[in-house]
């Protein structure tokens, strides 16, 4: 879709990104150490969310007054710590992941952040875990950052369990720009492209796609 608003954006140069980071909340020692330990893992560290995404997740949880949250795809725990810190005092976060090696790091940082009692981590296919949850609209916030081909199925399972006004966030919706490249026919790209096309037409939610990091879509249940 073309139009005069199409060019209403500011390109993020390295200097401007540094400025942006300097005017956002800085990660505390727990998150700084977690990010450093994750970076030391090598190329796999790219699976960690960006610092500004973590700040946004904490902000969202607080704005929503979230008590119950679900995360699909925990990795080393940066996003989980960010979400859990934004929950109300008696709030709880359910994390779903398959990898015990990466989540062992997450567990250490949950404890260090004083959040171990508020976060439940289940090592199992996320779709199986989600289907065990009551099919009642009790969840306030969801963050999906798992296998891309599973996003649509996760969404359909979680939406009935989300309260009206609750929010589902989808990470990597720009997929490095591949979603706008017709020649990219990889399974992940096709799945994300189809999800993006579907969500923008789904009248069950209000939607915004943000150019944050690798793209973050927020869907608010009507």
Predicted region positions:
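A short alpha-helical cap/connector motif
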Residues: 1-141, 148-169, 173-222
């Amino acid at each position: 879709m073309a139009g005069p608003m199409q060019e209403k954006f500011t390109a993020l140069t390295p200097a401007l990104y540094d400025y942006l980071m300097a005017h956002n909340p800085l990660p505390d020692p727990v998150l700084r150490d977690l990010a450093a330990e994750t970076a030391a893992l090598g190329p796999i560290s790219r699976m960690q969310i960006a610092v500004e995404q973590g700040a946004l997740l904490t902000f969202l949880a607080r704005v929503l007054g979230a008590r119950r949250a679900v995360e699909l795809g925990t990795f080393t725990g940066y996003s989980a710590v960010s979400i859990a810190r934004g929950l109300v005092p008696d709030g709880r976060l359910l994390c779903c992941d398959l990898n015990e090696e990466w989540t062992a790091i997450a567990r250490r940082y949950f404890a260090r952040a004083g959040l171990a009692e508020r976060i439940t981590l289940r090592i199992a296919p996320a779709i199986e875990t989600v289907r065990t949850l009551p099919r009642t609209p009790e969840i306030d916030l969801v963050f999906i950052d798992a296998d891309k081909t599973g996003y649509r199925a996760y969404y359909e399972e979680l939406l009935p369990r989300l309260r009206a006004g609750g929010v589902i966030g989808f990470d990597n919706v720009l997929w490095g720009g591949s979603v706008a490249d017709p020649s990219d026919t990889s399974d992940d790209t096709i799945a994300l492209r189809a999800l993006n096309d579907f969500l923008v037409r789904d009248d069950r939610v209000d939607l915004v796609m943000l150019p944050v990091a690798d793209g973050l879509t927020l869907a608010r249940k009507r």
